[in-house]
């Protein structure tokens, strides 16, 4: 578990002129721990200036927290299969971020990972907002309902998967989460929605190359 002292450790400037400066301070962020939330890793994100596709997940898993690299577990493998990208192309194509940046730990019930509180999501939104300002991506792919809701305000996956939206000049294409525990894809109509969404992503990626 990430431990912190009595002094605030997180610094946030009022403005950033470079992605590198933003990333340095994001990597050192302990805002959620300072607010009293239990965290099991340090912030996880990956990417560089010039990447025009932005991938927004929900929260790192345990493996991502250990390696401090996004999409390292089985969900990441499934996502790359969906996108038909190998690891090298995947990481060179997408700036990888998430709604909350640290592995939140297991749920108290023992069934899966803890869902980050709304306040945690609000604290982490600062980093996403500045990433999008500095990167100005042409494409944003959200993965999971929490990620889609954070940008689009949607209530459910049914109303957004298979469609393209706009956010500050970028095309936003939501995907469901590729976790094996999700039941959303069990329905044939939702599988068709996923097929449509992936076709939209590929079209956008092709247009940006």
Predicted regions and their residues:
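A polyanion-binding, active-site-adjacent surface
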Residues: 3-206
